[in-house]
Each structure stands twice: as structure tokens, then as C-alpha cells.
Amino acid sequence: AGLGFERSDFDRPTKELSGGWRMRIELAKILLKKPSLFLLDEPTNHLDIESIQWLETFLASYRGAVVLVSHDRAFLDNVTTRTIEISLGKIYDYKVPWSEFVELRKERREQQIAAYRNQQKMIEDTEKFIERFRYKATKAVQVQSKIKQLNKIDRLEVDEEDFSKMNLKFPPSPRSGTNVVDAKELSKSYGDHTVLRKIDFRIHRGEKVAFVGRNGEGKTTFSRIIIGELGYEGHLKIGHNVKTGYFAQNQDELLNENKTVLETIDDAAKGDIRSKIRDMLGAFLFQGEDVDKKVKVLSGGERSRLALVRLLLEPHNLLVLDEPTNHLDMRSKDILKQALISYDGTLIVVSHDRDFLNGIVSKVYEFRNNTIREHLGGIYDFLRKKKIDNLKEIEKKDVPSKEKTGESTIGN
């Protein structure tokens, strides 16, 4: 149950399950073996927030060793006590969790830069001496000594460039109407399977909200209804002058495979941002010769990142983002997060990444049992309240809905 399976799922053939749910089965099989060492590569990618929290508790209290590859900050902070970074072919081992490591890495990079500059100055002075006295017989011994000195130098390197302070701003877009999306008694079914039942939903201009809930509860379905990809029953009105931008994991299919990475972004860039194209691509892990690769040779993750960068360059006043951080490293997520915080349009984001959502959204919509429930406040306000609600359920205390401040059920 911790990974989101209901008892009714236990007898279902695995061929009926999506790839994400099959990954959960594989994770459950590993956890049940109780090995002395867990090696988990991005274990949270196919989990919802509740399942991630359960896995955190399980791993944090596990008596064996746990090695994680993850880009989920909150998950790492709640589970790990040691951080190992691989940078420029070297391994750095810190006996601290992620957040403390970030501060120590910052200090290390500052020290590296200072040492690198001092070494470069010494190399430059030595080369000038060699060039000046190369053909002077009285200095021949000194020149040869300096040449040997240069050849023996262990050249210092500085860790990869830190793009976290890169200021990415969305291009200006037209102002939309006050009511951006207005749904009333909206329902959606796939055959006999009901996903959404008579839900009401309204988002106003400038609001930033999160869609959360277990996989299969309708978050992506409702997102696709909003952008016009899926039919529905009931009423849905998109506001005046709304220009929608949508990102999902399959958006990479819309890219022109015969264009290069740089050409793809150059076509979308307008105005002052054009001068920052290469920096943007570098921030999203396209560096050096990568920008000259054809789209058709990129991996699925690379295509997904490229589609996201292109979206950020286009003028939209409503953004609907479905798991935008799945293929991003932490620096890329930071840049995207800061851009979304300063974004003056309307935002709907489907995500299980608590650290990413924190500071962006001011309202959370929980998808559960074919309805959506509105929670005022940020993602951690929602999670704190969920813990209280779960305790109330365990204690079987009935709380009248009128007493549930900051929360309302939207749907019948």
C-alpha cells in the first residue's frame, strides 16, 4: 500500500499496468528482499508525493546501506547522511546530507577558482620569462628549468560552471481575461472507467497552482482537457485572449528531427534572449558540441529537455506543465523554478517534486476518488494538513466539512 497499490490491484495482470506502475512493482520486489545494500537510481521518478514520503520513511529507518542517485532534494535530505559528487572525473566525498553539501561545494568552488587564477598567473609569468630569454645563452639553464617546471605542473581545473544564478525571463505575452479556466460539472471516462466526476474548477489570471495525487487519479487527463487534447462531458470555458503553452513527456515528438539543437532554439527565440541561447542550452545540459547534434540522434531525456527550453522561449500567458523536472538535474531545476516564480502569467503544474513546488504555487488541488479538492497555501502547508487528516482518519473522528479551514471539495 505504501507504493500506491490498492488490494483490488493485487490480482490484476501486469500487462494492464502502465510503465510507471510496473516500475513500482520492480521497486516493491527489491524492497521486500531486504538486502544489505540498496542501489536505487532515480527511485522517485514514477512515484506520487505520498508514495515518496512512505519510501523516505522506509529507507531512513532501514538498517542496511542505501546508495541513491536522485535529483529530488527533499528526498535526499530526508534519507541520506552522506553525499558523493562526481565532477570533472573526480570524486568528492562529504559526510553530510545534500543541503549541507551544497554550501560546502560552494566554498570548494571558490577555493578552486582562487587557486586556478593563481596558477594561471604563475604559468603566464613563466611563459613570458621563457619567451624573453629563450635565445640568450646566459639564461639557457634557467630557461630549461622553467620549461621542465611547466611540463611538470598538474594543471588545476574548476568544477563545472554554476548556472544557478542565470536570470531566465519569459518573453512578454498578451494579457488574458480574469477567468483563465472555468470548468463546471466536468466529467471524463474511458469506457466504463470514470476518472473525473462532475468537478468544478476555476483559475484566475496570475494564479499558480499544483495538481497532486496518486498516479491514475486524473491529473494529466484534466491537463489535456484544458489544452483541448481530450473530449469531456460538462462545461469548460477558456478565458479571453488565453495563449496556452503545454509541456508533457511526449512533447518531444513535435520537434523537427532534421534540425540541430541550436537551430531548434534559435527558431523560437525572439528579442534580447537570443544573445543568451547558448547559456540557456548549457544550463539545460546541452554544452559544447551537443548544440550541433541533430534532434533525431538525441535520447528521450535530451529531447524532453529541448522541448522544455523551447517552450520557455515562447510567449504564453497560461502554462500547463506536466512533470517538467523529470529529466532535469538540480541546477536546471533551479533555473526553471526561478523563472516560474517571476513568471507573471497563470501556471498549472503537475509535479511530485516538493522542493520544486515550494515557493512557486500558492494553491494545491488534490485529485482523489474522481474529484478534486482545493487546499489554500503552498505544498508544505498541504502536506502538513494531510498528516493531520490522515491521523483523523486513523482515529475515525468525523470532522464536519465546514470546520476544515482552507479546504474545499470541488465535485459531487
Predicted regions and their residues:
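Intracellular alpha-helical coupling/juxtamembrane segments of multi-pass membrane proteins
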Residues: 104-159
